[in-house]
Swiss-Prot record:
Protein name: Ribose-5-phosphate isomerase A
Described purpose of this protein according to its UniProt entry: Catalyzes the reversible conversion of ribose-5-phosphate to ribulose 5-phosphate.
GO molecular function, one term: ribose-5-phosphate isomerase activity
Broad EC category: isomerase
GN (gene name): rpiA
CDD domains the UniProt entry points to: RPI_A
Keyword hit for Isomerase: yes
Amino acid sequence: MADLQTQMKHAVADAAVEQIKDGMVLGLGSGSTAALMIRALGAKLASGELKNIVGVTTSFQGEVLAAELNIPLLSLNAVDRIDLAIDGADEVDPSFQLIKGGGACHVQEKLVAAMADRFVVVVDSTKLVDRLNLDFLLPVEVLPGAWRQIQKTLAAMGGSAELRMAQRKAGPVVTDQGNLVLDVKLEGGITDPASLEKAINNVPGVLENGLFVNLTDEVLVGEISDGVAGVRSLERRLS
């Protein structure tokens, strides 16, 4: 499955780069699929197929990779708008609502997505779900001095929250903003993403949570058919 999943990720990354035009200001996402997209973008810039592109990254991971590939970058504060943002997701529901933040970058990712004229999400088919949070925990970035109190508040809201621990350092994960992450599980999953996003963000000490509500314009889904990787486009229909 790992090889097939990698094929799907490459397929959607390449499809996303096809939407990039000369002169664009691009939001460059984080995570494994977004990294493949950034590499594909770097190759097109190096070959001259794309020109005058400027990127705005959503994480230190993306900043390092873009610099390695000689992709020109600007900070979020240096741009007034973003033409196109491309990013991955941890879960996508049928209404195009997302959970992001598996890489603890969801604060910057949401800022960039909100600024973009168009936000395209790139995922493999395993990320499509009927309901958010049944499998993937909801990340919530919190101030270090308040995490335990916020954990109690989230419990009162029906969520079981655990402090995310680092894998290759002693202690918790620390975000690019210097904060901590609580991973939250709601009994029965998330039935009303819009209301929950606001409710969690209203808790004192919470910086941002990983629910992305009504931000996505298109989802590019990598799929395997007859052993071959392909891409299906899902576009949000505005009512």
